[in-house]
């Protein structure tokens, strides 16, 4: 709502929530929501290694980080995008890519691949499919690269567009 309306109170609320999540309720790997009840946040700094950390929460945090970048700019939202993508989102997918996980505790090595929830597989797929939306952004006169991913993109800008070609082997 803050981006769509420009309402200052919404902007302040978004920034307060962003700070609460990223400074006090997110693990170093970008996971959030340690409580199994409603995949909920806990108290400030409640970040246990055996927390719940649902895959869809990681996808949602990427969406929130992208919107905060559009609202405020700044490197912190790009840093969160990168941390969550390469750690929390990818943690929800098996190494062979054939399974996904609903829960992603940091210290558990025996995760159950089957669950009755059907939200995570398509949400993880959607997030990975849209990585370009998270990687690039443009303003009237500025182009932004939030994720180091190889690719080519044409970004609309005031009075035209700019093309970018990114060559990298990062993060591999």
Cite the ranges covered by each PLM segment.
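Glycan-recognition and catalytic cores of secretory/periplasmic carbohydrate-active enzymes
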Residues: 1-172
């Amino acid at each position: 709502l803050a981006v769509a309306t420009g309402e200052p109170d919404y902007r302040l609320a978004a920034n307060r929530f962003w700070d609460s999540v990223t400074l006090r309720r997110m693990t170093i790997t970008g996971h959030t929501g340690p409580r199994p009840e409603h995949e909920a946040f806990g108290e400030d700094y409640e970040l246990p290694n055996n927390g719940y950390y649902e895959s869809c929460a990681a996808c949602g945090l990427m969406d929130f980080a992208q919107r905060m970048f559009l609202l405020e700019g700044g490197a912190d939202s790009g840093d969160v995008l990168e941390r969550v993508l390469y750690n929390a989102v990818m943690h929800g997918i098996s190494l062979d890519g054939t399974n996904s996980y609903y829960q992603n505790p940091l210290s558990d090595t025996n995760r159950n691949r089957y669950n009755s929830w059907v939200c995570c597989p398509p949400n993880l797929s959607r997030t990975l499919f849209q990585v370009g939306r998270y990687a690039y952004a443009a303003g009237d006169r500025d182009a932004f690269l939030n994720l180091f991913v190889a690719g080519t993109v044409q970004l609309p800008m005031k009075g035209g567009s700019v093309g970018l070609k990114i060559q990298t082997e990062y993060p591999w």
